[in-house]
């Protein structure tokens, strides 16, 4: 966007910040709206962007909620209504006046569509008539749909990954204030301030996405605006890929994509041959093995150290951009997986484990059955106990933390060659059966992956330099901080592109039942996700995990005479890219070891940049310094004045400047620090406000701690689908009648430190049920999440599992128990 258009938009926004919306019946739709179309494939959008926001009130007993106001902003034109019928009439009017059709839509954003659409779904149609017009992540989370087939709704939250307040600050349109505790109904008189509040929220959406449209080609290219935050990074990958047109990387991957697009339903000239069908079916089996072999970052919190306070001896070492480091420096399976020899004896098995002989220079997927599995150290398990990796097992026991496999009489699973080697590092096995092995040629990732990482790093570095300058000059604003965080998360989202699950649930909206219904699992057989293969994501996670496990051994598990780690108790916490350990003294040699590793990593990164720099600058026209990736993969070392953990992702720290920080998974972080005036301020949850001293705050972090609902910031979603009619006294003191038949109530819930929701779920089911679920290749975490399990809420669990289950076979299993 040029300077002139940016300035004109800023002045226009400044003049509209205090507007009062027009009642929908009095609104005159501008005739200029009907001019022009935006084309993309077979879709067309009117060159406008709309934003829709609703305001709701909750019944005193929290049994139901209702909408009392809606506002729709279309560019600088804002209207409002009071009822769902008003909204339906306004939508019909827009469709008729603008001549909206299935192929000529209005693009409309809703922030947190999961909430708003729960109130609208019985009033308007949400189904799509074409493929891709309805997209949902779960049965309740719709991220894209077509309202009455002509207004395309997109969830703003999954794109921006920011609260609406932050979006407003980013475009210099801060949200207004409103008392949400007051009860209002559609008949309650509203002040101009009430109307402005809702109008501002809708207006923020239109202005924010106008600026995003400018990034992706302007108002005439609305289809180019990505749907999600991950898709934004995918766009960057796609750009770098197409910039490599004509290179060997480009030709090789396009051929691979063309092969993956083969589908059994093709007929006539496009019908696949018998040999192609055999390869296709084999690839489907390999995809199942890949999904089974994938699991995320390694997490470890020593149970024997839980609740202990460590002063001035705890050091945290964090890997900067661990996943990007793996993509740049490690090798990956570059082509199709083919059958490989199965080891016939122990000597061949050892060769395969070390990547020698017949298996040299091949990335391997190994289907293995282990008998008599036992962890070498009770606290340091390696295999997670709740993932879909487990195909079959017998008498499986978990370690003290409940997160890792301690032992198993029999365990059948699929592993990458990287994880297979680590298996023997952390476990003893009485008998090993190798059932199947497939392999792919090892090699480094294509140049466009490196280019994407360097481009994202360059943008992040520019923002970082600017924010540091402003911080020194004390001119940094919250808007500057937000923009820096956006650039940081873009780099983190690159990993999300690599590990996007190729098999997902297909959801459709039923306009008769007003529910999202499962239509079974569907497999993405094309490499359409930003020209990244799923197998690369499996190995990215494996390499990052391998480095973390290696660091744990180096820092806290020295090898015994046989070369196996013996945990000395000094490593007390680890999570994905972070290791925390206790010092052995002021001159602990492990600190120097980490700095030495940093020097080696920096030399490696310097060579990567220098090798690619000339071509990168010639292709993209972006100058980059030699030390662009200087920090990538290096250890960021920090020593704490005080450290304490009570479980995985549950810990508190005190810095040497007196800053107290507390992290509890699922809750906003607490961050207590002194401002420029010497006063202590907090960003995050308020639970620790009641404790005056730092020592008291640290002491309050306890195993089994309970945080009241008014301080936990946890909101439990409770949906209702039945008709509620009630009389309530509104904020004006008048008795009003309210009728509502669908919606969502956000009920505050307390936090209790205890076993995870997944462990709760598994504890309520018999072991054979868990085994049957894992046989289906279904991620047990996703089952628990889909079941709607919340802290302190396991009522009617089995019924909710059936309602939100990901697979019809899963429903049948649960019905039997």
Where are the regions that the model predicts?
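Conserved acidic
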Residues: 60-110, 119-801, 805, 816-817
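Short beta-strand/turn micro-motifs composed of small residues
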Residues: 53, 110-111
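Ser/Thr-glycine-rich phosphate-binding loops at phosphate-binding pockets of nucleotides
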Residues: 53-61
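N-terminal accessory regions of nucleic-acid-interacting proteins
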Residues: 1-50, 54
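Conserved Walker A/P-loop ATP-binding site and its immediately adjacent core
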Residues: 113-115
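Hydrophobic micro-packing sites on short alpha-helices
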Residues: 810-814
């Amino acid at each position: 966007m040029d300077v002139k258009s940016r300035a004109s938009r800023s002045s226009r926004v400044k003049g509209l910040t205090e507007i009062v919306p027009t009642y929908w019946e009095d609104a005159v739709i501008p005739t200029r709206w009907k001019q022009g179309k935006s084309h993309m494939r077979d879709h067309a959008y009117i060159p406008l962007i709309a934003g829709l926001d609703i305001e709701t009130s909750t019944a005193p007993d929290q049994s139901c909620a209702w909408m009392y106001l809606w506002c729709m902003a279309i560019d600088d034109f804002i209207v409002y209504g009071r009822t769902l019928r008003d909204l339906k009439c306004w939508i019909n009017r827009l469709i008729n006046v603008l001549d909206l059709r299935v192929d000529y839509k209005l693009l409309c954003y809703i922030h947190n569509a999961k909430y708003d659409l729960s109130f609208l779904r019985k009033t308007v149609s949400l189904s799509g008539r074409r493929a891709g017009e309805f997209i949902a992540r779960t049965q309740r989370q719709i991220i894209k749909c077509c309202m009455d087939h002509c207004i395309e709704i997109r969830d703003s939250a999954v794109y921006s990954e920011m609260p609406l307040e932050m979006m407003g600050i980013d475009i210099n349109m801060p949200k207004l204030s409103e008392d949400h505790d007051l009860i209002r109904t559609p008949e309650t008189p509203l002040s101009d301030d009430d109307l402005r509040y809702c109008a501002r929220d809708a207006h923020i959406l239109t202005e924010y996405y106008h600026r995003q449209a400018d990034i992706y080609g302007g108002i005439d290219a609305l289809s180019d605006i990505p749907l999600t935050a991950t898709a934004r990074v995918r766009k960057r990958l796609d750009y770098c890929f197409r910039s490599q047109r004509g290179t060997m990387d480009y030709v090789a991957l396009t051929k691979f994509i063309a092969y993956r697009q083969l589908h059994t339903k093709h007929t006539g000239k496009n019908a696949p041959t018998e040999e192609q069908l055999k390869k296709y079916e084999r690839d489907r089996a390999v995809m199942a093995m890949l999904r089974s072999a994938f699991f995320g970052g390694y997490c470890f919190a020593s149970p024997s150290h839980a609740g202990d306070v460590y002063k001035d001896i705890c050091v945290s070492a964090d890997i900067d951009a661990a996943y990007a480091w793996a993509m740049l420096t490690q090798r990956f399976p570059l082509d199709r997986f083919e059958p490989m020899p199965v080891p016939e004896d122990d000597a061949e098995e050892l060769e395969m484990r070390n990547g020698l002989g017949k298996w040299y220079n091949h990335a391997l997927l190994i289907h293995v059955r282990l008998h008599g599995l036992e962890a070498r150290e009770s606290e340091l398990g390696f295999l997670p106990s709740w993932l879909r990796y487990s195909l079959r097992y017998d008498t499986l026991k978990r370690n003290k933390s409940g997160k890792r496999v301690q032992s198993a009489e029999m365990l059948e699973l699929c592993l990458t060659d990287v994880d297979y080697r680590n298996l023997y590092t952390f476990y003893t096995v009485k008998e090993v059966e190798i059932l199947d092995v497939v392999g792919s040629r090892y090699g480094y990732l294509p140049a466009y992956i490196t280019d994407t990482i360097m481009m994202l790093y360059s943008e992040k570095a520019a923002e970082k330099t600017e924010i540091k300058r402003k911080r020194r000059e004390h001119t940094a604003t919250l808007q500057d901080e937000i923009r820096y965080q956006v650039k940081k998360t873009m780099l983190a989202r690159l990993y999300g592109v690599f590990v996007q699950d190729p098999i997902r649930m297909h959801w459709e909206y039923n306009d008769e039942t007003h529910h999202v219904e499962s239509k079974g699992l569907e497999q993405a057989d094309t490499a359409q996700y930003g020209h990244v293969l799923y197998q690369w994501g499996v190995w990215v996670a494996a390499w990052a995990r391998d480095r973390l496990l290696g660091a744990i051994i180096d820092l806290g598990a020295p090898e015994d005479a046989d070369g196996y780690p013996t945990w000395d108790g000094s490593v007390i916490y680890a999570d994905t890219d972070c290791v925390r350990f206790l010092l052995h003294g002021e001159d602990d040699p492990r600190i120097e070891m980490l700095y030495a590793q940093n020097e080696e990593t920096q030399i490696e990164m310097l060579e990567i940049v220098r090798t690619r720099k000339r071509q990168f600058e010639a292709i993209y026209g972006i100058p980059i310094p030699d030390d662009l990736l200087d920090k990538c993969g290096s250890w960021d070392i920090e020593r704490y004045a005080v450290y304490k953990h009570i479980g995985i992702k549950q810990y508190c720290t005190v810095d040497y400047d007196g800053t107290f920080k507390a992290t509890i998974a699922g809750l906003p972080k607490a961050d207590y620090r002194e401002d420029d005036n010497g006063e202590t301020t907090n960003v995050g949850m308020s639970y620790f406000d009641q404790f005056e001293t730092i020592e008291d705050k640290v002491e309050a972090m306890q195993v089994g701690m309970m945080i009241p609902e008014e301080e936990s910031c946890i909101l439990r979603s409770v949906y209702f689908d039945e008709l509620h009619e009630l009389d309530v006294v509104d904020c004006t003191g008048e008795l009003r009648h309210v009728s509502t038949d669908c919606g969502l109530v956000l009920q505050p819930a307390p936090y209790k430190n205890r076993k995870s929701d997944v462990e709760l779920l598994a504890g309520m089911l018999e072991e054979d049920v868990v085994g049957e679920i894992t046989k289906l290749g279904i991620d047990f975490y996703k089952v628990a999440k889909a079941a709607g399990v919340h802290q302190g809420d396991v009522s009617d669990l089995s019924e909710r599992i059936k309602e939100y289950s990901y697979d019809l076979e899963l429903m049948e299993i649960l019905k039997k128990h």
